[in-house]
């Protein structure tokens, strides 16, 4: 596409028409399966505690908030959707905006479209099957490859991520010319994520989608720990053509355990000099009330559309990315 004036959409109108058709196809996919579409707030008084996520925030100064009320733009609709699940919604999905105050570039935009869905009584493997069904319908791609996080590291880095100590991880990082970052990093999971991003991701999902599952228990986030191997969590990610497309969990239903994880996140934030974030106690209360056993997944729709259209960057499939917003 030739250079356009900044008032014009960065994406060709033809691409936006195809994008609209894909959005309609996604809705048909879930309608055919009896999954309810829901809408949840874009702003909340609480936010994520994950040390790797940076939310936008604003202040509400309307009636009843004379001193101002801090609100956070949602990085994902997960917390509100789980409250619906606890209230008895059954299977649900949402197509909506999420916001992350992070990078903007070829595969990132601070405002993006997220597809998130939850399936009561599904385990991680059954949900992976459904994700694959959706990808094949939208992308007309081959059947996926599936490998564990441990297998991925052993295959591409010749190191066991579940048993390697920090010295061994730094040694592996040195082989990737990452010593300038790894040598001063004390957090084991950050080292693992660095190795995964640089040493594993570029080699998986090149010709067909790749599901990587059983991430380390220390990276469980909102997922349950495997009952078969307590070293790993029931969590998966999906990669295709060098792009991370989705992140899914067999969801943690224990409110007390989830609260402990959030509190640990905030302690980690404090150690790193990051602001501590307000914990969503409405989510904790919903979990304690009773979240059904379920699995859920979040998928980046802009990236999905980019792959479906064979586009090179998100700005080819988004009308007005941040530079033109």
Curated annotation (Swiss-Prot):
GO biological process: lysyl-tRNA aminoacylation
EC number: 6.3.2.-
Listed GO CC annotations: cytosol
Binding site for ATP: 100-102, 109, 244-245, 300
Signal sequence coordinates: none
InterPro entries according to UniProt: Aa-tRNA-synt_II, aa-tRNA-synth_II, aa-tRNA-synth_II/BPL/LPL, EpmA, Lys-tRNA-synth_II_C
Gene3D superfamilies: Bira Bifunctional Protein, Domain 2
Keywords: ATP-binding, Ligase, Nucleotide-binding
Alphabetized Pfam families for the sequence: tRNA-synt_2 (PF00152)
GO MF: acid-ammonia (or amide) ligase activity; ATP binding; lysine-tRNA ligase activity; tRNA binding
Catalytic activity: D-beta-lysine + L-lysyl-[protein] + ATP = N(6)-((3R)-3,6-diaminohexanoyl)-L-lysyl-[protein] + AMP + diphosphate + H(+)
Family membership noted in the UniProt record: Belongs to the class-II aminoacyl-tRNA synthetase family. EpmA subfamily.
Role summary: With EpmB is involved in the beta-lysylation step of the post-translational modification of translation elongation factor P (EF-P). Catalyzes the ATP-dependent activation of (R)-beta-lysine produced by EpmB, forming a lysyl-adenylate, from which the beta-lysyl moiety is then transferred to the epsilon-amino group of a conserved specific lysine residue in EF-P.
Assembly and oligomerization: Homodimer.
Official protein name in the record: Elongation factor P--(R)-beta-lysine ligase
Species assigned in the record: Yersinia enterocolitica serotype O:8 / biotype 1B (strain NCTC 13174 / 8081)
Organism taxonomic ancestry: Bacteria, Pseudomonadati, Pseudomonadota, Gammaproteobacteria, Enterobacterales
Gene field: epmA
């Amino acid at each position: 596409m030739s250079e356009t004036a900044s008032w014009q959409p960065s994406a060709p109108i033809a691409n936006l028409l195809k994008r609209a058709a894909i959005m309609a196809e996604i809705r048909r996919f879930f309608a055919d399966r009896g999954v309810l579409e829901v809408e949840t707030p874009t702003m909340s008084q609480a936010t994520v505690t994950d040390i790797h996520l940076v939310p936008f925030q604003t202040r509400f100064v309307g009636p009843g908030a004379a001193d101002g009320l801090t609100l956070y733009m949602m990085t994902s609709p997960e917390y509100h959707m789980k409250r619906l699940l606890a209230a008895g919604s059954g299977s649900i999905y949402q197509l909506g905006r999420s916001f992350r105050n992070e990078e903007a570039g070829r595969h990132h935009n601070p405002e993006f479209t997220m597809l998130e869905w939850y399936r009561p009584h599904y385990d991680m493997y059954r949900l992976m099957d459904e994700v694959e069904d959706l990808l094949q319908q939208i992308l007309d791609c081959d059947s996926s490859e599936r490998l564990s996080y441990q297998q991925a590291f052993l295959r591409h880095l010749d190191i066991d991520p579940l048993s390697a100590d920090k010295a061994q991880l730094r040694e592996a990082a040195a082989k990737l010319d990452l010593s300038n970052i790894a040598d001063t990093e004390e957090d084991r999971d950050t080292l693992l994520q660095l190795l995964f991003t640089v040493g594993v991701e570029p080699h998986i999902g090149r010709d067909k989608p790749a599901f990587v599952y059983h991430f380390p228990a220390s990276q469980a986030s909102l997922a349950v720990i495997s009952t078969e191997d307590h070293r790993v969590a029931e969590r998966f990610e999906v990669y295709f053509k060098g792009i991370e497309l989705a992140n899914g969990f067999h969801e943690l239903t224990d409110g007390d355990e989830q609260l402990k994880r959030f509190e640990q996140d905030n302690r980690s934030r404090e150690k790193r000099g990051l602001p501590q974030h307000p914990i969503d106690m409405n989510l904790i209360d919903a979990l304690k009330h009773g979240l059904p056993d379920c699995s859920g997944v979040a998928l980046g729709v802009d990236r999905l559309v980019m792959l479906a259209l064979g586009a090179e960057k998100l700005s080819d499939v988004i009308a007005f990315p941040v530079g033109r917003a």
